[in-house]
Amino acid sequence: MTRWWAAVSDLSLRRRLRPALGLLPPGSGLLVAVSGGQDSLCLLKLLVDLAPERGLHLHVGHLDHRWRPGSERDAQRVAVLCNVWGVPFHLEIARTPPASEAAARAWRYCWLEQIARGLALERVVTGHTLSDRAETVLFNLLRGSGGAGLGSLDWERPLGGGVRLVRPLLGITRAETGAYCLAHHLPICIDESNANLTFRRNRIRLELMPYLREHFNPLVEQTLARTGDILHAESELLESLLDEHWHSLVQEGRLHRNTLAALPLALQRRAVRRWLSVGLGRQPNFEHIAAVLGCLSAPNRTRTSPLAHSLLVEVQGEWLGLVGG
């Protein structure tokens, strides 16, 4: 790539990044999660260039899942790049490979939060893009998620321990991060597992999204991401409305039937979802929520089928309670 093209690419992405800079206040301490793939390399290069003018204090975190032979070479490449750019590098290697994508995600975020807290860094920054957000909306839609799930993968959220997770590239597509890396000759690490179609997200990325782009909407990524934005805003509104009723709804871990029944159906479902997620220690599915709502007019001592961990919901006079089966 010629220098002028690199300059144009740089200017374009920095302009696209500008709306997200409010998430990265001047003087912030950032732990940047860098796998070595194109999205995280693009993010790191943009932040390295922005750091002097914004007073950003950067550290890089890299996790080796040990899912494939040669994964240690990715860590070595990222470490070399960090040394060239003068960014402290932190590495974590899995003792045993995570058993699933969900387990790997939980492990990553737990470690990133711990490192950020240990270094007194306020934010963990990841390279999730607009393309990731579009794929997440589609993935959750196919799973039957409600508005909260479809509006997930937000720009910022609490990670824990006072650390916040920030995704400043959610307005930039994967094609753009690839072009940026090419223009700046960044050494992209290729993860062969991203081509494994046994992973449903890979099948969405490699088969379903290209089909939708060709046959339905050439801007399908932008359309789905915008839908996620709209649903997230509506979900936040519903959550704030639910907060206004929460203290009258829940007392001593039980749910008040008449107060719940007086709410609109959308708030009823959200109330039950929030209540069950605390009691069960996991997110309930639609059938669990429907079973609880079916108890609103049921006789005293009516019980649902077991929901999770042998727990079920029982009608206790004016209240609904979680009990062991």
From Swiss-Prot:
It is found in: Cytoplasm. ATP binds at residues 35-40. Transmembrane segments: none annotated. Gene3D superfamilies: 1.20.59.20, HUPs. Keywords: ATP-binding, Cytoplasm, Ligase, Nucleotide-binding, tRNA processing. Its EC number is 6.3.4.19. It catalyses: cytidine(34) in tRNA(Ile2) + L-lysine + ATP = lysidine(34) in tRNA(Ile2) + AMP + diphosphate + H(+). InterPro entries: Rossmann-like_a/b/a_fold, TilS/TtcA_N, tRNA_Ile_lys_synt, tRNA_Ile_lys_synt_N, tRNA_Ile_lys_synt_subst-bd. One of its GO terms (biological process) is tRNA modification. Its main location: cytoplasm. Signal peptide: none annotated. GO terms for cellular component: cytoplasm. GO terms for molecular function: ATP binding; tRNA(Ile)-lysidine synthase activity. SUPFAM superfamilies: Adenine nucleotide alpha hydrolases-like, MesJ substrate recognition domain-like. Belongs to the tRNA(Ile)-lysidine synthase family. The N-terminal region contains the highly conserved SGGXDS motif, predicted to be a P-loop motif involved in ATP binding. Ligates lysine onto the cytidine present at position 34 of the AUA codon-specific tRNA(Ile) that contains the anticodon CAU, in an ATP-dependent manner. Cytidine is converted to lysidine, thus changing the amino acid specificity of the tRNA from methionine to isoleucine. This is tRNA(Ile)-lysidine synthase. It comes from Gloeobacter violaceus (strain ATCC 29082 / PCC 7421).
